[in-house]
Swiss-Prot record:
Pathway in which the depicted protein is active: Porphyrin-containing compound metabolism; heme O biosynthesis; heme O from protoheme: step 1/1
Gene Ontology CC: plasma membrane
GO BP: any one term: heme O biosynthetic process
Family membership: Belongs to the UbiA prenyltransferase family. Protoheme IX farnesyltransferase subfamily.
Origin: domain of life: Bacteria
InterPro entries: Protohaem_IX_farnesylTrfase, UbiA_prenyltransferase, UbiA_prenylTrfase_CS, UbiA_sf
TM stretches of this protein: 14-34, 35-55, 84-104, 107-127, 133-153, 163-183, 208-228, 231-251, 258-278
Protein name as annotated: Protoheme IX farnesyltransferase 1
GO molecular function: protoheme IX farnesyltransferase activity
Other remarks on this protein: Carbon 2 of the heme B porphyrin ring is defined according to the Fischer nomenclature.
Localization per record: Cell inner membrane
Cell membrane keyword on record: yes
Length: 283
């Protein structure tokens, strides 16, 4: 395998997103930001996320070969062996948990493990090929990253981290179902029961809209409960309204174009919420 293929195995963009999620959990409860702690937390989360990604590559190599988007992945092409992948995944997870425990505490390490367990065992192995609820349950993997970040600072302040974890949990279906509409033919070809394959694009678009309504409501809870201030509340309300606008258009037009726009819009929405948490707490 080439160096580039090893990097692809790690799914670095997802790893970075998980790290940013943990940093947000850290920032939500910290009274001041320790750059060294943030660096160590980032590294631990990247290691844990990368471990889950490698396992996903190994387990899904058969269906990856059937989908245009994933057919060139290293495990799908045979560039890497399952034994190599499993070994790398174990090493990365052990390293991530060891770092989390040494730099912070066992609670951070536990949440790191639980996030990986949900993604690997519950989503990848159990639900992905069996039921359309796969991505709903799998969304809990990101929620554990928020809790890990919070536990790195204080293991007693749980209300705000739990609400933010709920936001992450609700964000995942709205984000991923848009992608699933875009890639419905791929999933159908591979026999993966993503929601658009099961109920069609139109009903999926309605599900996205309904889910986002709940998501935006949940995102306003930190402001409504007085856990965060007006800066966060304003950002959550405006960005939520914009995302809902994209969802409404998707309900009217379920073309690949608007599915792609909805998928793309969900990313800056979450990033803006992350920034707003930090802005409200530390700036």
């Amino acid at each position: 395998m080439t160096f580039r293929q090893y990097i692809e195995l790690l799914k670095p963009r997802i790893a970075l997103m998980i790290a940013l999620t943990a940093i947000t959990g850290y920032g939500a409860v910290a009274t001041k930001v320790d750059p060294v702690a943030l660096l160590l937390l980032t590294l631990a989360m990247i290691l844990g996320s990368a471990a889950s990604a490698v396992f996903n590559h190994v387990w899904d190599r058969d269906i990856d070969r059937l989908m245009r988007r994933t057919s060139r992945r290293p495990m799908a092409t045979g560039a890497g062996t399952p034994a190599l992948g499993f070994a790398l995944a174990v090493v990365l997870m052990v390293a991530g948990m060891a770092l989390a425990n040494a730099a912070f505490n066992w609670v951070v390490a536990l949440h790191l493990f639980l996030g990986g367990f949900v993604y690997v065992a519950i989503y990848t192995v159990w639900l992905k090929r069996r039921h359309w609820t796969n991505i709903i349950i799998g969304g809990a993997a990101g929620s554990f990253a928020v809790l890990a970040g919070a536990a790195a600072v204080d293991q007693t302040q749980w209300l705000l981290p739990m609400v933010l974890a709920l936001v992450l949990f609700l964000w995942t279906p709205s984000h991923f179902w848009s992608l699933a509409i875009l890639l419905a033919d791929d999933y159908r070809q591979a026999g993966v029961p993503m929601l658009p394959v099961v109920v069609g694009a139109k009903r999926t678009a309605w599900c996205i809209l309904a889910n986002t309504v709940i998501l935006v409501g949940a995102s306003l809870l930190p402001w409504g409960l007085g856990l965060l201030g007006n800066v966060y509340g304003f950002v959550a309300a405006v960005s939520g309204a914009v995302l809902l606008g994209f969802n409404v258009v998707l309900v009217r037009d379920t073309s690949r174009r608007w599915a792609g726009w909805n998928f793309a819009a969900s990313m800056p929405y979450l990033l803006l919420l992350f920034i707003a948490v930090f802005a409200d707490k530390h700036w």
